[in-house]
Each structure stands twice: as structure tokens, then as C-alpha cells.
Amino acid sequence: MSASYLPSILVPLVGLVFPAVTMASLFLYIEQDEIV
């Protein structure tokens, strides 16, 4: 199995996408809370 390229994809994915999703969900939660 050629899974040696997996970390080079997962590390940036987890390092960039996860914080972005967290920031986006937090931003939407704050915006929704301010509207209501």
C-alpha cells in the first residue's frame, strides 16, 4: 500500500482546515447570538 504520502496530505489538512472550520463555526455562533 502506498500510504507514505498520507501524512503530507493530512498534516496540512488538519492544520489548516480544522482551525478554519472551528473559527467559522465560532463566528457563526457569535453572529447568530448577536442577532437573537
Swiss-Prot record:
The keyword Lyase does not apply. Signal peptide: none annotated. One of its GO terms (biological process) is photosynthesis. The chain crosses the membrane at residues 9-29. It is a single-pass membrane protein. Its main location: plastid. Keywords: Chloroplast, Membrane, Photosynthesis, Photosystem I, Plastid, Thylakoid, Transmembrane, Transmembrane helix. It is found in: Plastid, Chloroplast thylakoid membrane. One of its GO terms (cellular component) is photosystem I. It holds the Pfam family PSI_8. InterPro entries: PSI_PsaI, PSI_PsaI_sf. Belongs to the PsaI family. May help in the organization of the PsaL subunit. NCBIfam families: PRK11877.1 (NF008830), PS_I_psaI (TIGR03052). This is Photosystem I reaction center subunit VIII.
